[in-house]
């Protein structure tokens, strides 16, 4: 199928490696969270929402693993223990929901005070505008929390892109390489899966989406992981969003 022939009702975009550079996430966002997590927890330790996150983090199997690594783990859970655990999870690149939620709150402070601006590739705003003008919905599915997703697009280098976006999904709907997650998204969007185009940089995610009936395209942005030959042969590949700007809604057979 050529880009000019492709139709969809919804474009579902990944963030890291798709709309936003991997380097921004790993060289800006993650270090910012690591540097600021302890101060953030000290300032908000007694807040009910933060305590709920702390409780959820203690239920993670990695929490006991982390305490084993400590020479002298504290008798009680305190700021230093949880801050260290968060830094450990970030270093291990473990995408667990309570940690992602906490990261989102830390980043919110950074975006609000102007220390952070969300990176998007230069072709993203024009594609968003074209898709919305054509009547398509744009939704986001990322391992980062919904709050963090809104911050990247709401405080981007080119301004607020949130008006283009109609739905956000994170790991609460399931893991990104699980077919069921994409079925859940289609159900929540109330759309036929084949009318949803998923854009990602990860073959495993594209395969899961395709198994659920979605269309899937893999983005080969600068800095993205190289693909094996069999992966290149199995999926449609694109360098950016430019060739997708002509996406159209399917023609209603009663209007044709």
Swiss-Prot record:
Cofactor note: Binds 1 Mg(2+) ion per subunit.
Subcellular location: Cytoplasm; Nucleus
PANTHER family: ENOLASE-PHOSPHATASE E1
Annotated substrate binding sites: 142-143, 176
Subunit-structure text: Monomer.
Name listed for the protein in its UniProt record: Enolase-phosphatase E1
A molecular function (GO) term: magnesium ion binding
Organism, scientific name: Drosophila yakuba
Pathway: Amino-acid biosynthesis; L-methionine biosynthesis via salvage pathway; L-methionine from S-methyl-5-thio-alpha-D-ribose 1-phosphate: step 3/6; Amino-acid biosynthesis; L-methionine biosynthesis via salvage pathway; L-methionine from S-methyl-5-thio-alpha-D-ribose 1-phosphate: step 4/6
Job of this protein: Bifunctional enzyme that catalyzes the enolization of 2,3-diketo-5-methylthiopentyl-1-phosphate (DK-MTP-1-P) into the intermediate 2-hydroxy-3-keto-5-methylthiopentenyl-1-phosphate (HK-MTPenyl-1-P), which is then dephosphorylated to form the acireductone 1,2-dihydroxy-3-keto-5-methylthiopentene (DHK-MTPene).
């Amino acid at each position: 199928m050529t880009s000019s022939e492709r139709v969809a009702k919804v474009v579902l975009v990944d963030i890291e490696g798709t709309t936003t550079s991997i380097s921004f996430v790993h060289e800006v966002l993650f270090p910012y969270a690591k540097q600021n997590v302890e101060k953030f927890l000290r300032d908000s330790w007694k807040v009910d929402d933060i305590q709920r996150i702390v409780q959820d983090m203690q239920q993670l199997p990695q929490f006991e693993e982390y305490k084993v690594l400590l020479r002298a783990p504290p008798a009680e859970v305190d700021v230093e223990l949880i801050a260290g655990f968060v830094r450990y999870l970030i270093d291990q690149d473990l995408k667990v929901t309570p940690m992602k939620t906490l990261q989102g709150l830390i980043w919110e402070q950074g975006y609000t005070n102007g220390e952070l601006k969300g990176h998007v590739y230069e072709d993203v705003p024009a594609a968003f505008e074209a898709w919305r003008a054509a009547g398509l919905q744009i939704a986001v599915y990322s391992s980062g929390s919904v709050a963090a997703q809104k911050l990247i697009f709401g405080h981007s280098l080119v301004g607020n892109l949130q008006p283009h976006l109609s739905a956000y999904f994170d790991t609460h709907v399931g893991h990104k390489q699980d077919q069921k997650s994409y079925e859940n998204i289609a159900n929540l969007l109330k759309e036929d899966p084949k009318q949803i185009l998923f854009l990602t940089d990860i073959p495993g995610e594209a395969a899961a989406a395709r198994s659920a009936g979605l269309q899937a395209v893999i983005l080969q942005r600068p800095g993205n992981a190289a693909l094996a030959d069999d992966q290149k042969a199995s999926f449609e590949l694109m360098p950016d969003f430019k060739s997708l700007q002509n996406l159209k809604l399917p023609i209603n057979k009663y209007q044709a």
